[in-house]
């Protein structure tokens, strides 16, 4: 089974739309694809259960079906940094629990597991625990989502440098236009990303207000 981790250059970089696009792309390759959002804040109550909209969107794009708790083990209502939300809730985000949650999918009949992170790459989860430590242990290939906004060149370069320093493999990167208006000189910035980044550009996704109903796989490069 292939395991992919969708990381962002920062918060609101477009991770969810990119992750859903990647899931659609893999499904079109005739793969059985499972999804995870291991840690999520900004959750809401639905039928007596805390759920996260990003996780629900991922589940809608997947062609496999698993219980919500398998997809999103840690849920927090407050829309704040997960380690702070966890502390407020009297919860400690546990590395072993996260590793076991991922390992559970390894025992299922699936071809790929797509894991969406939270926040940026170096997300703190608990005292002495950051998301990259989990990503490395589950041997996931990282897909970096670059939100096309001012500062994205620096953020992309720093994120990729950090991913490699953590000993993780990079599957490629996806550019996402994050708002209705393109960033200043967007075409030139995208060209600069292509020049500066050695890793493969997987897709470039425009701003799509109704993206949950779109075929996002068309934005992947052949």
Swiss-Prot record:
EC annotation from Swiss-Prot or TrEMBL: 6.3.3.3
Pathways involved: Cofactor biosynthesis; biotin biosynthesis; biotin from 7,8-diaminononanoate: step 1/2
BP term (GO), one: biotin biosynthetic process
InterPro entries, A to Z: DTB_synth_BioD, P-loop_NTPase
Coiled coil residues, start to end: none
Chief localization: cytoplasm
Sites where the protein binds ATP: 12-17, 54, 116-119, 176-177, 206-208, 213
The protein's name in its UniProt record: ATP-dependent dethiobiotin synthetase BioD
Native source organism of the sequence: Idiomarina loihiensis (strain ATCC BAA-735 / DSM 15497 / L2-TR)
